[in-house]
Design a protein with these regions (language model features):
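Metalloprotease/metallohydrolase-associated module, dominated by Zn2+-dependent proteases
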Residues: 1-46, 62-102
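Active-site recognition of the HExxH zinc-binding catalytic motif
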Residues: 49-61
Length: 102
């Protein structure tokens, strides 16, 4: 499980909470508190889906894009399908980013 993420230079803590603690949603993002909450007990795939979904919310808020929930959902599903259909893609992107001079 991931406990910390950096989104556009801002560090977020990631908390995993029970269904009792997070009853109405699978995840939530609190930009001002630098916090992402994920409901525990999901399958690994669903947990990854929720984490990516909340990261897109964090990007949306940082860029002030004002995405709708549907746009965030569709972007999440699209990226997950892209990664599933192209399993070498994440490794390739990561290797290119690691070698890039900033």
């Amino acid at each position: 499980m991931i406990s910390r993420l950096t989104v556009l230079g801002k560090e977020y803590n990631v908390q995993y909470l029970s269904e009792t603690e997070l009853p109405d949603r699978l995840g939530e993002t609190y930009t001002e508190q630098s916090l992402i909450k994920i409901r525990s007990g999901q399958s690994k795939f669903d947990e990854a889906d929720t984490l990516l979904h909340e990261c897109i919310h964090a990007l949306d808020e940082r860029f002030q894009l004002n995405l709708t929930e549907r746009q965030v959902y569709c972007t999440t599903v699209g990226l997950l399908c892209l990664f599933k259909d192209n399993p070498d893609m994440l490794q390739y992107i990561s290797s290119v980013i690691d070698k890039r001079e900033v």
